[in-house]
Amino acid sequence: AARERFADVGNVTIHLAGGEDPFADLMNQHATQLGMENTHYENATGLPSENHYSSARDLMRLARHIILDYPEHYAIYSQKHFTYNNIRQPNRNSLLWRDDSVDGLKTGHTEEAGYCLVASAKRGETRLIATVMGTSSSEARAQEVQKMLNYGFRYFETERLFRAGQELMASRVWGGQADEVSVGMPEDIYVTIPRGSREQLESVVDLDSVIKAPIKVGDELGRVRVVLDGETLVDEPVLAL
């Protein structure tokens, strides 16, 4: 349904939500949860409507959510063809044929929006998402996204800063059987940074001023921030290990 606009799928989702307006409300709620600050849905089709809009940054956020939270479904976006009811339809993302590192994600076109594309590619440990909106043709959108991807892979790299379960530090515990508790991250933390800039990263762990027992594994005890040239790249909770 994400690659080809099947009316049947739209009708099913609208039916499950109790109508198109309630379905749009659900989409707006989810968009808010994802931090999509410049997006508002009015329908399930994506067709133009007065108060139906999004931004390139918000579409990137949505793409990132799909890639990270639904890896079991993400492979569908790399399929070059889809057959339904004995009709074989090509994926309109032409970059799938041009660049082996591209594995998604979604094209779009209306007269008002122009030719749009949200694409993702992975080379080595680095995954990038590139978005264009309002281009003049399907070829133009492919070329512009390819330029952005090539630029990104040339000048940026992805580094793993923290491993899941890795001890960042130990902190004093008051009133417990143990004097200290180890703190760390619940999952791997990656950043994409300009090549050669890892040594310039600054990490700061801010723990609660007083940590009192009882403490169980997974309790949030503070936050870790990673800064590069004054910009905060990571701001995540640190937990008891």
Regions found by a protein language model. Give the residues of each.
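Short helix- or helix-capping micro-motifs
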Residues: 1-3
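Acidic/histidine-rich, surface-exposed loop or edge segments in extracytoplasmic proteins
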Residues: 6-11
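Mid-domain, small-residue-enriched loop/turn segments at the edges of structured enzyme/sensor domains
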Residues: 12-64, 68, 75-77
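Domain-terminus/edge residues, biased toward the C-terminal soluble/receptor-binding domains
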Residues: 48-53, 57-241
